[in-house]
Amino acid sequence: MKKSKASALLWLFSLVGFMLHAQTFNLNQPMVAQNVIFEEKDGLVAVEAEYFYKQTHTDLREWYRTTKDSVAVVGRDEDANHYLNASNSSYIEVLPDTRVTHSDQLVRGVNFSNKPGQLAVVSYKIKFNSPGRYYVWVRALSTGSEDNGLHVGLNGTWPEHGQRMQWCDGKKYWMWESKQRTKDEHCGVPHAIYLDVPKAGIHEVQFSMREDGFEFDKFVLTTNSNYVPIDKGPNMTLADGNLPSSYKSKSEPSYFNTIARKLPENKFIASQEFPIDGTNFYKNGKNWLAINPEQYKQAKISTLFDFESGTYDVIYVGVGENDGRSTFRIVINNKELGTYQPPLTQMLWEEGKAFNGFWKNVKLNKGDTITVEVQVASDGNEWTRGRWAGIVFAPVGQGYVVQESPSTYIFEK
């Protein structure tokens, strides 16, 4: 009996090992067919990094997909899974990652390549309707100083202005960047990474490893030198072929949108529904208002309560940040309802119950003026932006229940 159980366990472990190996093997293979062609329209094209149709130069390093449920196991890789807030909940990473810190040995042509096109090259077909200069933006996540470099090329060539893309800011969260590292500027020169597309038609855009451990989520090509992608970037456009069924063009609802619609009796005002002219606020992505601390340190904004008069539980959805605790003050008809500061978060930004302001049994009349005053804060190095998502008015006694929804981790730290 014991021998039978031991044999069964051995068989099970062997099967699991085989499955893990097979999964790792598949994670470096193209997800899309060779006939998949993305399309540039009006000077803009966006592509998910995991939708390469071909990968070459893989003897020493390869790109592997990471998803919520799949992580490649191919040698050293000390990073956590960063699928949270990755576009399409997936990204690719150059593995193995043997140079994690500056003290690790640098081996040129193995874990580092200042020459483009030498290691781990992924290719994408794009139909360009217009020739011209296209500035390259890449959404990447860097955890240190040795996983923040990449090269980009066109049709098998690697022009000087596609070499040495560099990330210095925003460690440990997904960030768009378009800078070129130079001898004089190690953190990169803006507007210096671009591809010159000679004529309309189908061309191949390629990326190759500069440093192993690089995590690559999405890229955008644009003819507009002033364009800056935000959030997860624009949607993709296809000229031909089909994407995998797993592709989701719509993101999941944020914490605010989830709790605002949790009960049919809820009333809510999203922050971006407040009139912002002259308030010192700006629209931060699709869900928040925020303050640019380089211009202002505080902001004030008002709107009318245009719902049925009554008594409500009031939930103010602020955003936790990792560089300080902003102060939020809510006023109704010139009378303070309350003031609070969301706690610090281990993420860059986070929505959730812990970051809310909450007041019970608040009497409100239709036509009341609701005012929000925000003061930014600093940890001594960086400033918060006083981000907030909106206000939910829940039935009395339901406010605690309404807040119980999963947090939105906008970027993982």
UniProtKB/Swiss-Prot annotation:
Q: Give the Gene3D superfamilies listed for this entry.
A: 2.60.120.1620
Position of the signal peptide: 1-22
Q: What is its main location?
A: periplasm
Cellular compartment(s): Periplasm
Keywords assigned by UniProt?
Periplasm, Signal
**GO CC annotations?**
periplasmic space
Expression induction per the record is: By ulvan.
| General function of this protein | May be involved in ulvan degradation. Ulvan is the main polysaccharide component of the Ulvales (green seaweed) cell wall. It is composed of disaccharide building blocks comprising 3-sulfated rhamnose (Rha3S) linked to D-glucuronic acid (GlcA), L-iduronic acid (IduA), or D-xylose (Xyl).
Q: Quote the protein name from its UniProt record.
A: Uncharacterized protein P23
Q: What is the protein's species of origin?
A: Formosa agariphila (strain DSM 15362 / KCTC 12365 / LMG 23005 / KMM 3901 / M-2Alg 35-1)
